[in-house]
């Protein structure tokens, strides 16, 4: 073996491997919209909104509730509920196995989390869909957790907010999942009868049985920028009508222009704007919002590839 190979090439390869392994996994994230390579700690400060192009990335249900509700006084509702494979459903894989895999991947028992707490000091109850759990699909547990949150609002005379992110009803639960559309719609009718506000916040994406029920039944319907919202997907519609759809079809901006939703609010503005709106709807004093101080972050040079 030559001296050059021993003295130069092998140490160079070893240094390269050490350098690669010293970069923690998940430290960098590529924006799916503009391909900018973003430093994860910086992205957390912007609530997972790309600082380069303002793309609102998908975030988990628990993270969403944590950034929306006040820190103190949160309590999760329906935490004891777990899904059951009553139909012994199987497609390419057993439903029971799909549930186990989704629970392991997300750390959640099902695709909806509900919490009571406060928003700028005002008592509220909030629910959020976990899209990473089987596409945020709505089954019996999702429906029951939503109903328990609504019942909490009824018992405590407080408003309810839901952050929807779902592909629709859960196929593996068949009619049981479709029944949740009626079940959730019925409890929202009770909220309306009692004069308690329900605000629906549509995030990317909202489709199927969720968009056809609870997601579009808000007293005020809000969406994040550029969220995909519809019943069937745009490709399915194009194949059905055999026509090219308008640019931006099913994006939140398109729906706002056509009167299907009430407003679009950036993620960073949801707390103050919804807090102010709910205070007006509940005839309460305007809450005081203090924007968090964002400490500057020193961003190291981005890697060439991630």
Curated annotation (Swiss-Prot):
It catalyses: N(6)-carboxybiotinyl-L-lysyl-[protein] + acetyl-CoA = N(6)-biotinyl-L-lysyl-[protein] + malonyl-CoA. Binds 1 zinc ion per subunit. It is an enzyme of class 2 (transferase). Its EC number is 2.1.3.15. PROSITE patterns: COA_CT_NTER (PS50980). Keywords: ATP-binding, Cytoplasm, Fatty acid biosynthesis, Fatty acid metabolism, Lipid biosynthesis, Lipid metabolism, Metal-binding, Nucleotide-binding, Transferase, Zinc, Zinc-finger. It holds the Pfam family Carboxyl_trans. It is found in: Cytoplasm. It comes from the Bacteria. Its main location: cytoplasm. PANTHER family: ACETYL-COENZYME A CARBOXYLASE CARBOXYL TRANSFERASE SUBUNIT BETA, CHLOROPLASTIC. This is Acetyl-coenzyme A carboxylase carboxyl transferase subunit beta. It comes from Pseudomonas syringae pv. tomato (strain ATCC BAA-871 / DC3000). The lineage of its organism: Bacteria, Pseudomonadati, Pseudomonadota, Gammaproteobacteria, Pseudomonadales. The gene is accD.
